[in-house]
């Protein structure tokens, strides 16, 4: 059984689209059914990560966790984030998810 990818996106909506496009492009599939199942949560409600890091802006972790949990509920077996700055919060987010 194939795994389902969950894209925790919206932190740069174009980065989310770009990553999804790359997943499709590199997948060796001859038919639609041979592609990898991908769930996307393009959550534009996630506060600015740079502002949180540099100037004490709103904490993005709660909204990132909500997105991760939504993706898990959608069947994601693995989560990926197409945002470099979001990885600053990786350890905090992964405490709340099983994926």
Listing of model-derived features with the role each one plays in the protein:
Residues 1-99:
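Non-catalytic structural scaffold of enzyme domains
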């Amino acid at each position: 059984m194939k795994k389902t990818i969950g894209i925790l996106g919206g932190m740069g909506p174009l980065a989310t689209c770009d990553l999804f496009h790359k997943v499709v492009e590199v997948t060796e599939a001859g038919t639609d059914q041979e592609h990898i199942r991908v769930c996307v949560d393009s959550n534009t409600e996630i506060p600015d990560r740079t502002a949180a890091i540099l100037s004490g802006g709103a904490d993005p972790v709660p909204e990132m966790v909500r997105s991760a949990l939504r993706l898990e509920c959608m069947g994601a077996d693995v989560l990926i984030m197409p945002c470099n700055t979001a990885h600053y919060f990786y350890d905090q987010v992964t405490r709340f998810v099983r994926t």
